[in-house]
Amino acid sequence: MEPIIANPRACLGTGLVVAAAVLVIWLVTAGADGFGLVSFLVRFLHVLAAMVWVGLIVFVNFIQLVALRAADDQGREFLHKAIVPNVAWWFRHASTVAVLSGALLLLLAGYLAPSLVYGTGVYMPPPRVWLVWLGVIGALAMWMFVHMYIWPNMQVVLGIRPGDDAAKAQARNRVITFARLNLIFAVPVTFAMVAAAHLY
């Protein structure tokens, strides 16, 4: 057990193995439905990626930015080398996986081209459709914040792209602004997506 606990990747792998075992038990007891299984696995991937993405939005706004503001130059340099690049990597890739899996899920659920999936039109209650598309538009805006504003400016802050002190200060302010916007959007987007599936 200790080798697993000592390695976060081993912990994640163990969790995935346990989840796979639960899925196998379900398939044995309930039977297999190929299309339903694919839809579920895409949804599961989408939820996992969204959890990481929103979790990191909370981390960046309430922990990372606060720590960077409070740290001295030496502490800030350490955070920029050891923490911020890793957070940015997970942030970017989780957002992309969430958006791509979400797009695939829209197709599988019949919100996009239902006749291609089901062979006929699929009725979706208008309130549910509006909630889903509200979430989609908000999520795409959040993804754009990450890849078009936060990451390019973060590269200047981290010294990956050239910039003098004034450019770094301006880039830092832009990162904070769009990180805050991501936090604002995260709550209604999550609400809309969950409500579309579960709000009676």
Regions found by a protein language model. Name each.
Residues 1-200:
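Polytopic transmembrane helical bundles with strong interfacial aromatic enrichment
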